[in-house]
A protein has these predicted regions:
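RNA pseudouridine synthases
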Residues: 1-266
């Protein structure tokens, strides 16, 4: 039958059994069958070390740093203490200062992160995020099929989200108990990506809230753009990477009060 309206499934895609719902009651039936353990974006230690060695630092002073996180690297250490932005900067600043993560990006997402070096700066930056004075822009690549939907070139998506308790880390649209999630978008135009120069549509995404997987769900859900981001293994189809990138970040430096603005291309 059809998937529940809270689920995001794309017609024609194969979705393996999941650990959350299926394995506890059907383990004996799943022997020899692919089980989705929701760790599809996991990167081995060797790859993570290589990613950490080419971490790009755009700005650094005694109070904060702005870095470009590559796709495949964690923002903070996982359960197996994998390499992360946090651990790399802790090592870099060892004996000088600590690293305080102000915000995070999914492992599969690339782009800009600001990291504080003192607890006071950390609190001040977090307050800016709470007051929504921090400006963020993401760039994503969508399949050409989005052009067939004849959507407005600019728009606003409001779909409340909550975690799926039986299928983590997936999020679901929950109009009863979900937290407000608001995204503005602007279609930019056609582009190419990857070694094969495949065609896609570039879109700018402006999150006005910061829910887990917000941009991914708002793109994929039928009541959003109904078009998953290319490479989104949770809500669409796998590819060489998730083509979602935090391209612009703007905030006020808590110490100098200077307005800081950073850009990095996808």
């Amino acid at each position: 039958g059809p998937s529940p309206k809270t689920e995001i499934r794309q017609h024609g895609n194969y979705y393996p059994a999941c650990n959350g719902k299926c394995k506890p009651i059907l383990e004996w039936m799943l022997e020899g069958i692919d089980v989705d353990d929701k760790d599809c974006n996991r990167t081995d230690n060797k790859t993570q070390l290589a990613l950490s060695e080419r971490l790009q630092i755009l700005y650094e002073d005694d109070y904060l740093a702005v870095v470009v996180k590559p796709s495949g690297l964690l923002s903070v250490p996982g359960k197996d203490n994998q390499a992360s932005i946090y651990s790399i900067l802790c090592e870099r600043w060892k004996g000088k200062s600590d690293a305080f993560m102000v915000h995070r990006l999914d492992m599969a997402t690339s782009g800009l992160l600001v990291v504080a070096r003192t607890s006071e700066v950390h609190k001040a930056l977090q307050a800016q995020f709470i007051r929504r004075t921090v400006k963020k822009k993401y760039v994503a690549l969508l399949p050409l099929s989005i052009l067939d939907k004849q959507l407005p070139t600019e728009g606003r998506i409001e779909l409340p989200l909550s975690p799926d308790p039986d299928d983590r880390p997936r999020q679901r649209v929950d109009r009863t108990n979900g937290k407000p999630a608001i995204t503005e978008y602007r279609l930019i135009g056609k582009t190419t990506y990857g070694e094969k120069a495949l065609e896609a549509v570039k879109i700018a995404l402006y999150p006005l809230t910061g829910r887990t997987h917000q941009l991914r769900v708002h793109c994929a859900h039928p009541d959003g753009l109904s078009t998953p981001i290319i490479g989104d293994n949770l809500y669409g189809q796998r590819a060489e990477r998730l083509w979602l990138h935090a391209a612009h970040l703007e905030f006020t430096h808590p110490i100098t009060q200077e307005r800081m603005s950073f850009d990095t291309p996808l």
